[in-house]
Amino acid sequence: ELEVTLNDNRKFPAKIIGADPTTDIALIKIEATDLPTIPFGDSEKLKVGEWVLAVGNPFNLTSTVTAGIVRARSRGNSGAGGKDRSKIESFIQTDAAVNPGNSGGALVNTKGELVGINTAIYSETGNFAGYSFAVPISIAGKVANDLKQFGTVQRAVLGVLIQDPQYVPDAEKEKVKVFEGAYVGGFAERSSAKEAGIEKGDVIVAVNGVKIKFHGTNRHDSDPVTGFAISLAQIKK
């Protein structure tokens, strides 16, 4: 059983609508009225150096707020959060202090808008060591909507092995015509992209009209939905 305690100490039994281990996000439902809400910000507009606030309950110290700045956007996993998080390529990295009990708490901008969900730290001790990570609200929002509509997160697979075009092997680099996008280094055993004519050495520069920068920028906007056709823009090798 799951019980939710609100800031005014009201308690409600909660029903789990769905959960997504990859993002460590669950959608729950309670039967209640007069619930406050928080406005959503645009995590895609966050800038490196911008101030943010992390809200949570570290070490059971309720309603703790820490401040920091955005250190990086679209940060890869880098070992934070365990193997399930390796599929997330768009963490917001901050230096706001995050400790056990902060996970699931809000990351807000200076306008009080929700821009991320605090989820992990990079530490050898288990406590804050200067680096914390949050799932951008643009991804968390998609996860919540999918859980509400389908019960699970809808993730389609193109079956391509990609890498940053700037770091392809020297023998292949002279064939690369653009250096922003996703370089196709190979294919999975079953690949819808290969069947559609994508070739090894191509650079995918947009999905459904959304420009791609390597390592997850705009990844959530361009995520294909299972069962629907998508449009790829690529530069041929």
Predicted regions and their residues:
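Serine-dependent protease modules
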Residues: 1-199, 206-237
